[in-house]
């Protein structure tokens, strides 16, 4: 009995140390955005090939090849700064995600859509929360926008939380708006207006 009690105490001490270590690691995590270059093809391919596709649009090729990465990077080179902001997400010096804000057109030209993807092993580290904050600031400064919109499948709670932490408001839910394979999802419409603080 005494031995079991000692093991339980040791377990609790180790668990507490592990939690403190994770919290410290999150504090020290440095997240930056960088412009994509052609030299980043393999990093982009790795991110898109390993992406959890449950809540992504089907337009992203699967498998995602180096040729797909090349095509996308060429498109970004033409559009960046004019029709959107397209960045690699860098955490502790390594490219771990992709994030963009793409302008809409016609009567929606003062609006843009936010999109992002992060390697699954990097989830729950605060990386995308920081990346969204940074790209929204850049997009409002560079693209003459009144708002940024984000569309999220209703069950994607982690992504919704990222947006809410960055001052996005849930503006509505489009019922049965997404059909992916055999699944039907509601689509949450989030918005952030120029000048709104977190």
Each language-model region and where it sits:
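Positively charged N-terminal leader segments that act as targeting/secretion signals
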Residues: 1-12, 16-21
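Intrinsic disorder/low-complexity segments
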Residues: 9, 58, 70, 89-92
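A short helix-loop-beta-strand connector motif used in the catalytic cores of GNAT acetyltransferases and
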Residues: 74-88
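Conserved GNAT-fold acetyl-CoA-binding loop/helix
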Residues: 53-75
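Acyl-donor (CoA/ACP) binding surface of acyl/acetyltransferases
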Residues: 17-54, 86-198
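Generic signature of intrinsically disordered, low-complexity, basic-rich segments
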Residues: 2-4, 65, 127, 135
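Intrinsically disordered, low-complexity regions enriched in Ser/Pro/Gly/Gln/His and often acidic
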Residues: 14, 29, 64-65
């Amino acid at each position: 009995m005494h031995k079991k009690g000692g093991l339980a105490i040791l377990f609790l001490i180790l668990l507490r140390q592990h939690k403190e270590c994770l919290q410290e690691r999150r504090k020290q995590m440095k997240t930056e955005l960088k412009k994509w270059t052609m030299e980043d093809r393999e990093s982009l391919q790795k991110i898109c090939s390993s992406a959890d596709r449950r809540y992504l649009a089907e337009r992203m090729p699967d498998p995602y090849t180096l040729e797909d990465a090349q095509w996308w990077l060429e498109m970004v080179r033409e559009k960046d700064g004019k029709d959107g902001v397209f960045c690699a997400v860098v955490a502790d010096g390594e490219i771990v995600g992709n994030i963009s804000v793409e302008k809409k057109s016609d009567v929606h030209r003062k609006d843009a859509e936010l999109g992002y993807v992060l390697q699954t092993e990097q989830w729950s580290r605060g990386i995308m929360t920081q990346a969204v904050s940074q790209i929204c600031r850049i997009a409002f400064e560079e693209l003459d926008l009144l708002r940024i919109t984000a569309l999220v499948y209703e069950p994607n709670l982690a992504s919704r939380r990222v947006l809410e932490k960055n001052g996005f408001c849930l503006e509505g839910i489009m019922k049965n708006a997404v059909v992916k394979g055999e699944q039907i999802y509601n689509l949450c419409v989030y918005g952030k207006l120029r000048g709104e603080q977190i």
